[in-house]
Amino acid sequence: MIQLKNVERSYKTGPGQTWVLRRINLEIQQGEFITVMGPSGAGKSSLLNVLAFLDDQWQGEYWFREQAAHAKKRKDRAELAKKNVGMVFQSYHLLDDLTVMENIDLPLSYKDIPRSQRQTLVADALDRFQIVAKKDLYPSQLSGGQQQLVGIARAVIHNPALLLADEPTGNLHSSQAKEIMELFRELNQQGTTIVQVTHSETNAAYGTRTIQLRDGWLVGDTGNPRPTTEPSDAAVNR
């Protein structure tokens, strides 16, 4: 599904430059659930931004579904992202002046979808994420966990082939975090490819593969045993 070849990213710092990604070579297969881990400043979020087409200042090759994304214009990359990628941010990124229903509908409003069909899709998402009662509220009226559920609903409503999540449970208490990770597992079992950035070993245990970054370099790539049950209490409390 995805292949990165010698992808690098740097920022100018005075007369020199600071590298945040160094010679990244990575393949991601359809249906994988990948966790990206590493210390602060390792390049985790930078990698996610490249995968999401939010950053186009990198060097190297990015193949997405056999398309050479690195050879496309910015407008064409944005179109590729709209059709294929959903993004969940740690800070939610909901629009304050839109209701829950309107926030979830936003990705659909960019597509040529009849209004009646959009309304049905939004209603299904509200029901799926158990936030029907919150549909007319604004983000400021929601708890952190509720806002994150809205963010996830918005990210997946157009059935993206790829779901990217940057510390999606970082500000949540354990029960909310567990609920969101169970939703991720369900989405993955239904065929969605997921790449999450996290510091949490508990969250990492939900994935099928863990990638380690350090100082911009990919230093580890290991498969995770697929759990038949939810992570143990011992793992949750680590």
Where are these regions (language model features)?
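ABC family nucleotide-binding domain
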Residues: 2-210
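Short regulatory "switch" loops immediately downstream of catalytic or recognition motifs
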Residues: 11-12, 222-224
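Intrinsic disorder/low-complexity signal
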Residues: 31, 104, 220, 229-232
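H-loop (His-switch) and adjacent beta-strand-loop-beta switch element
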Residues: 210-223
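ABC ATPase nucleotide-binding domains
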Residues: 225-238
